[in-house]
């Protein structure tokens, strides 16, 4: 490649990097807000369908992501380290503070050039998470940097059975490592083949087969391509609404 070609490639890469606000050390520029003081468990589940993030293993440090980050639910359960850009906003940012949040919700767009509109990178955080990096009294928005990090979870991966009749759906939560799930397959004890599940919404996956009265095994692949198989994690006596754990087997 001649020097002109090398220069062109360099310029293209530089423009691509600047377009998403990426820094040379891996941090990406974004903005953050918080969605109020009502952080009861029932108010934090959101578009990922976790219902109660505390029961799902995520605690109070959660966030709704803009569409650019949420990716139609693919980021549900993923972890992000967020720090306030103190040099850009020393009045409201806490110097050197960072917090790790779990993606549990979607921050919707609006017709008023909102912060969550595409292609913006934005975190609408729970107030406990937000005030780990910003001063209290701030009711506006702060500039931040973020990066994707591994999730540290206690206990095993959790499988919550949902649906009714022969409509089977499972909500997968408390996932360590990469945190966010790319694909799921299920196998009942009466069958020999894995059935590929489809994302119904958020962290909820559905299958087309009737799996009632069977022990269930799941093959879970994360967005970082790591896969684990959880054999017979759900007993044949399962019913809708019950949650089962992989008993310590976890992604790292």
From Swiss-Prot:
Entry keywords, A to Z: Cell wall, Cell wall biogenesis/degradation, Membrane, Secreted, Signal
Gene3D superfamilies noted in UniProt: Expansin, cellulose-binding-like domain, RlpA-like domain
Topology in membrane: Peripheral membrane protein
Expansin-like CBD domain ranges (all copies): 166-246
GO CC term (a single one): membrane
CDD domains: DPBB_EXPA_N
GO BP annotations listed: anatomical structure morphogenesis; plant-type cell wall loosening
Signal peptide: 1-23
Keyword Membrane: yes
Main subcellular location of this protein, as a coarse class: secreted
Subcellular location: Secreted, Cell wall; Membrane
Pfam families referenced in this protein's UniProt entry, alphabetically: DPBB_1 (PF03330), Expansin_C (PF01357)
Keyword field contains Cytoplasm: no
Superkingdom of the organism of origin: Eukaryota
InterPro entries xrefs: Expan_Lol_pI, Expansin, Expansin/allergen_DPBB_dom, Expansin_CBD, Expansin_CBD_sf, RlpA-like_DPBB, RlpA-like_sf
Expansin-like EG45 domain boundaries: 45-156
Function according to Swiss-Prot or TrEMBL: Causes loosening and extension of plant cell walls by disrupting non-covalent bonding between cellulose microfibrils and matrix glucans. No enzymatic activity has been found.
Family, as annotated: Belongs to the expansin family. Expansin A subfamily.
Name recorded for this polypeptide: Expansin-A12
